[in-house]
Regions:
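Short inter-helical turns and helix N-cap capping residues of alpha-solenoid HEAT/ARM repeat scaffolds
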Residues: 2-3, 41-42, 72-73, 104-105, ...
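Alpha-helical adaptor scaffolds
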Residues: 51, 63-67, 74-114
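Terminal, low-structured helical/coil segments at or just beyond the last alpha-helical repeat
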Residues: 153-192
Length: 192
């Protein structure tokens, strides 16, 4: 009988060694994981399977990741969103967009909008603006993080400042002492 520790160790090894494998081995492992994840009943094991799948850049990993983005466990959906965010494909963008718009768990929506920030285009811009306008501060912050990746700009932590920037303004960034030292020392914030 295989224990949880054995499975965890094997999946961790698989994840850590994926990049060094030949393409054929990556395809073999990604195909097997994509199939196994659909049969696995234990959420923690599925979670580790998804983490391993994310490490495989081959298309064969995508069926397992697509299954994972609709998993009943929100933590698994979050990891799937992060994984899809590393894949710059139309399929990845569409799945993330659907998840951002329809998932009921805030953590999953946050992960989806953060991942959407890795993409380019007008639709990405529009979705990030929607995130900035959301009522939930976690979603607003995810929108800010997405815009930082999308634009390379840094307008602080205030969603209103970012919204002004999206409308073509060069907003004044004022610091009220609640920012962390990293924000204060960011070169983009020192030389405005």
């Amino acid at each position: 009988m295989t224990t949880w520790n054995d499975k965890h160790r094997a999946l961790t090894d698989l994840r850590e060694n994926a990049a060094g494998m030949s393409r054929n081995k990556q395809v073999l492992h990604a195909t097997a994981l994509s199939s196994q994840i659909k049969q696995e009943q234990v959420p923690v094991v599925r979670r580790e399977m998804v983490r391993a799948l994310v490490a495989f850049p081959v298309v064969e990993a995508e069926s397992g990741l697509e299954f994972a983005i609709t998993d009943e466990d929100a933590d698994i959906r979050v990891i799937a969103c992060q994984g899809w965010g590393k894949r710059q494909t139309d399929r990845a963008f569409k799945l993330l967009l659907k998840t951002w718009r329809s998932d009921t768990e805030i953590d999953v929506r946050v992960a989806a909008i953060q991942a959407i920030g890795n993409f380019d285009g007008e639709q990405v811009f529009a979705e990030l603006v929607k995130a900035l306008s959301d009522r939930d501060p976690a979603v607003q912050f995810a929108g800010i993080q997405g815009f930082r990746k999308f634009s390379g700009e840094d307008w602080g932590e205030d969603p209103e400042t970012w919204l002004a920037w999206t409308q073509g303004e060069r907003p004044e960034v004022t610091y009220n002492g609640r920012e962390n030292i990293v924000d204060l020392l960011n070169p983009a914030n020192l030389f405005r």
